[in-house]
């Protein structure tokens, strides 16, 4: 059945076939790997050949061996490569010896007859798609020391129950996605993290208890678990993704309106808002979860109780929101909390707030008044500047169209003025040393900027899509002694074949040459220039940064 030749059976031969099994000799390690071949029927892999151990199944070793029915693995085996048994559709059972320390991606995926698998004790992580689409799999014996399960059992439609060992810390993306027969799963007390779609489309799952220590119920975690009605979340959970429980029996049981789990407000159910776009959050609510009210596009005003201490990311991306009063006791306002609220006009930050994220007012085109309570120890709006300034580093975190940047500000924070109406003329203070990424991005009115000599760092995207940027000539654009960005010719999108960095330049900024699609040589001056590690982001194959000596050696 197999090609075989005794003269190939020599220890110093790199590849040979013996008893129908193809091997590769590893001279450096003095061991053998099993290579792909046309394997059929029952296979037994020996522990030793010529007194050297067989330690590895190579990538694709038994890939698509449709007539392989059984295999015996040796106790010397240490590694099972990527897709080693993928699409072995007649293989019903496999015993993996405890000597195996590593299993590759897709190792047993699409083994549609595989019913039982026992995994070795030495495995600490079950890899992506390890048993994906093993539609006959009913029994899995997991090692007691496994810490992470990736999308290992996605699409195992016959799996009805599984015991996860104590010590498990994380379930990865789609870990049990599409396990349509899964009825029971007990999560260990050591579990700390669930990832997106971990249990999505487990249609027969009726109840689940998430252990203490888990803080986040992620996107699509239980999406499509149509029979899931009994859900117990721990007190440690601080956020539930807005899509985590879509198409579950639990969600179906909830009334239209604001949807809560204990003291978390995590989404809105229904189509129309009552009371002309006004909502009141119930007393006792501690957290407004990420994106919780994004679907309330017609929301115009909302009353928050003083029990609220955290507002999540992009919680109020509400097109018509005009009025909101931040409650006393609020401590955290996370990134983008009011992103894309173009009708919001005024906001006051309470004294209790100690953490504010980036992108806070991106797209708030009509925001005119920002005030921080004078007793706040972490932030202020000094000199009625209409901005939020972090005291510890004098960073302007968020501004609006009426902001007057104070003279002692040292940093303009990430996305501080992004997508807002600003004046055409901007004079930055003499104290300023850094402008963070996207600080003025999409400020289309901004035409002229006076940069102070103190400015030493300008991050990527700081002035993208502004009138100032549009006015810059093609080629290298400088801000003080910083090469901020290289601008291709507007119509052709092309650049000159080389760019000589001007004398006196101290820094080439992050993403200075990003996305260039034509070859460009960048020649540095004789003195030292700090080149950001991401200066050529997404253009590494086209942009070459050279010293003058390197340029002289290759120039045409």
Give the label of every model feature segment.
Residues 59-61, 82-84, 104-107, 127-130, ...:
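Consensus positions within tandem repeat domains that build extended binding/scaffold surfaces
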Residues 1, 7, 18-22, 27-29, ...:
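Structural signature of tandem-repeat unit edges
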Residues 32-33:
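Conserved recognition-core residues within compact binding domains
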């Amino acid at each position: 059945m197999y090609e075989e030749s005794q003269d190939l059976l020599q220890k110093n031969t790199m590849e040979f076939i013996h008893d129908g099994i193809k091997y590769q000799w590893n001279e450096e390690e003095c061991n053998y790997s099993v290579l792909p071949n046309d394997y059929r029927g029952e296979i037994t892999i020996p522990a030793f050949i010529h007194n050297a151990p067989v330690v590895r199944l190579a990538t694709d070793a038994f890939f698509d061996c449709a007539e392989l029915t059984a295999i015996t693995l040796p106790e010397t085996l240490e590694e099972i490569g990527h897709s080693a048994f993928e699409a072995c559709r007649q293989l019903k059972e496999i015993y993996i010896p405890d000597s195996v320390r590593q299993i590759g991606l897709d190792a047993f995926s699409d083994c549609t007859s595989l019913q039982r698998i026992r995994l070795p004790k030495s495995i600490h992580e079950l890899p992506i798609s390890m048993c994906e689409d093993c539609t006959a799999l009913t029994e899995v014996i997991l090692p007691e020391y496994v810490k992470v399960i990736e999308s290992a059992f996605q699409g195992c439609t016959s799996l009805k129950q599984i015991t996860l060992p104590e010590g498990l810390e994380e379930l990865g993306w789609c870990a049990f996605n599409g396990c349509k027969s899964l009825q029971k799963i007990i999560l260990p007390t050591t579990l700390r993290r669930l990832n997106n779609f971990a249990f999505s489309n487990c249609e027969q799952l009726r109840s689940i208890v998430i252990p203490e220590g888990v803080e986040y119920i992620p996107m699509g975690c239980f999406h499509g678990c149509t029979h899931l009605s009994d859900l117990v979340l721990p007190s440690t959970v601080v956020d539930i993704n807005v899509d985590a429980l879509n198409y579950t029996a639990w969600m179906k049981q909830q009334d239209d309106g604001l949807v809560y789990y204990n003291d978390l407000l995590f989404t809105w159910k229904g189509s129309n808002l009552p009371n002309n776009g006004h909502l009141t959050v119930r007393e006792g609510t501690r957290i407004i979860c990420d994106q919780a009210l994004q679907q309330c596009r017609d929301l115009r005003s909302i009353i928050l109780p003083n029990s609220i201490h955290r507002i999540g990311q992009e919680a109020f991306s509400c097109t018509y929101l005009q009025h909101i009063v931040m409650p006393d006791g609020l401590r955290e306002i996370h990134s983008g909390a009011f992103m894309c609220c173009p009708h919001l006009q005024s906001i006051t930050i309470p004294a209790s707030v100690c953490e504010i994220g980036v992108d806070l007012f991106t797209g708030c085109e009509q925001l005119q008044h920002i005030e921080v309570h004078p007793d706040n120890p972490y932030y202020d709006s000094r000199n009625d500047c209409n901005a939020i300034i972090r005291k510890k580093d004098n960073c302007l975190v968020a501004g609006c169209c009426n902001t007057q940047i104070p003279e002692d500000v040292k940093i303009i924070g990430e996305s501080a003025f992004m997508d807002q109406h600003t004046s055409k003329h901007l004079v930055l203070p003499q104290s300023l040393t850094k402008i963070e990424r996207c600080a003025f991005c999409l400020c289309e009115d901004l035409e002229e900027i006076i940069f102070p000599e103190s400015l030493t760092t300008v991050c990527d995207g700081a002035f993208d899509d502004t009138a100032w940027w549009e006015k810059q000539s093609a080629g290298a654009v400088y801000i003080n002694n910083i090469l901020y960005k290289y601008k291709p010719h507007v119509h052709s999108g092309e650049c000159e074949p080389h760019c000589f960095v001007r004398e006196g330049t101290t820094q080439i900024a992050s993403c200075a040459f990003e996305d260039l699609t034509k070859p460009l040589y960048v020649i540095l001056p004789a003195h030292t220039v700090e080149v950001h590690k991401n200066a050529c982001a997404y253009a590494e194959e086209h942009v070459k940064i050279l010293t003058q000596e390197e340029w002289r050696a290759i120039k045409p």
